[in-house]
Amino acid sequence: MTWFIDRRLNGKNKSTVNRQRFLRRYKAQIKQSISEAINKRSVTDVDSGESVSIPTDDISEPMFHQGRGGLRHRVHPGNDHFIQNDRIERPQSGGGGGSGSGQGQASQDGEGQDEFVFQISKDEYLDLLFEDLALPNLKKNQHRQLNEYKTHRAGFTSNGVPANISVVRSLQNSLARRTAMTAGKRRELHALETELETISHSEPAQLLEEERLRREIAELRAKIERVPFIDTFDLRYKNYEKRPEPSSQAVMFCLMDVSGSMDQATKDMAKRFYILLYLFLSRTYKNVEVVYIRHHTQAKEVDEHEFFYSQETGGTIVSSALKLMDEVVKERYDPSQWNIYAAQASDGDNWADDSPLCHEILAKKLLPVVRYYSYIEITRRAHQTLWREYEHLQATFDNFAMQHIRDQEDIYPVFRELFQKQSANQSA
């Protein structure tokens, strides 16, 4: 009975190559569909896949056909409604077809095609969602680098554990050794066998010579057989070595206003932004620490669950969060050893006398030590004192950015704007 073992890299997913080719070919349409989809679903569900629809016209294959114009004579069998020179009315748009907007009137005629819909996996979804995004101004600090050791193949070695033995390379060495050790004997054996065959057919018979040749042939065959099939000299083992790969250390501070002026809709949008940010950081950078700070009149460092789901509320003093961040930086994150980033979300409401203090803390303590500080104001109202104070910071510091979010649909575009990967010219 014959057994076939499928060792293809794709395994059970036989169409992986075709799928990857399809994703590359229609990348623009897929990214557009993802941008629309993220505004229609909760960002807490972003860790799953997505059904993507592409207009049928965008995936149609090129084909040869007759050009418009010219004179043609066609015979349509079974026609009992029209005669020559009759005009046929165009089918009403949106009727019967699946490519319409779905907002028109029903119709009894007309044809069309639905959009092409397929499912992309969680990894494919996140790859497209966070493509071309990076932490701005990421630099490798020289004082202390966190070295990650990755295992790399480094040829073969003659010593190792049985689990790493290379069967193919060992058999190749065995064949080469046996060939080298027996090549001369095999040539001599072939010559003796040829001579024996010649003598055995000669007249008169040479019995003594035949006996001598048979004895030498037997001795040569015994010597060849004594050469071992495999020897410890032949064994080769796959060699692996760990190479240090320096990776930059980064910490992201997430500051969120949970004061009484933040209504539930505003808090939800802030939560969505930070959930998106958290997924981006945890997926793109494996060595990024995240510090969560919630604030109203008082600031507190919390864990991830409390940051998103705690019901605590109060007044509004933004400087309390900035002071706490400064304390945490001094205590745990030396700027010479860490790349420090911060993202702050608020509705813009703040005690009027506190806004100048926020400006002072940022200008003198935080912005000189952080790589990038982003401020997101979530409100439909007019900007207040905090926004105006921060505008002065944006004009002075290159590592400070601010954006305005009015609706849920603004979250993803603002997120991409804040963390767009810089080109070489921009970073220079």
Swiss-Prot record:
Biased amino acid composition, Gly residues: 93-103
Family, as annotated: Belongs to the UPF0229 family.
Source organism of the structure: Salmonella typhi
NCBIfam families to which the protein is assigned, alphabetical: PRK05325.1-2 (NF003707), PRK05325.1-3 (NF003708)
Segments of skewed composition (Basic and acidic residues): 77-90
Residue numbers spanned by region Disordered: 77-111
Protein name: UPF0229 protein YeaH
